[in-house]
Amino acid sequence: VEVRIIFDDFGNLTRLHDETLQQIQNAGIEVEVFNPVHRYVNRIYFNYRDHRKIAVIDGYYAYTGGINIADEYANLIVRFGHWKDTAILLRGEAVQSFTLMFLQMWNLTEKEPRWDEALLPSPPVEAEGYVMPYCDCPLDDYKVGESVYMDILNRAKDYVHIMTPYLILDNEMETALKFAAQRGVDVKLILPGIPDKKAAYALAKSHYQYLTAAGV
């Protein structure tokens, strides 16, 4: 079985030891490090991080969500109390979109990009509704993720419920959240009570007063 892993270097600087990485590679697993941290790297590029969590299996199944590969996610260690996270399982043609997302990142450093052999056909499944996975990256000129959220907030008629570990808003996004609540949409946000990033937690709290005053 071909097993490939991409991980972001910044998030593993102090937690992934060279010996562990070597054991993974010795087991026949291919590994790519996204945007390795180097003191000579331009600070703008240093901020280009890959925060996506994607697992694709044989073209049949795709998992995505907030779950990393780390001991606290398996409750082997306790860092911030009981660790709760969410992921979803997808089947059908949407799986190919996740395969392409993975290959796009993998092939950034490949001299001979591999596409076709990994794009296995995804058997169709019967389902109500429509699933359209999307992604964005620092190389894009268009902010896909932000645009999707803005469209959801501007079109919503009944409710918008969002669960996120980090609430980092620009003025446009904060205004969209407040405006949706003010026109009668039930807007609810769920955030961690115990932060893993204190700076991000403080930044999120700076928005609370303005959001709650608008009815969020």
Q: For each predicted feature, which ranges?
A:
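Charged, low-complexity intrinsically disordered terminal segments
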Residues: 1-216
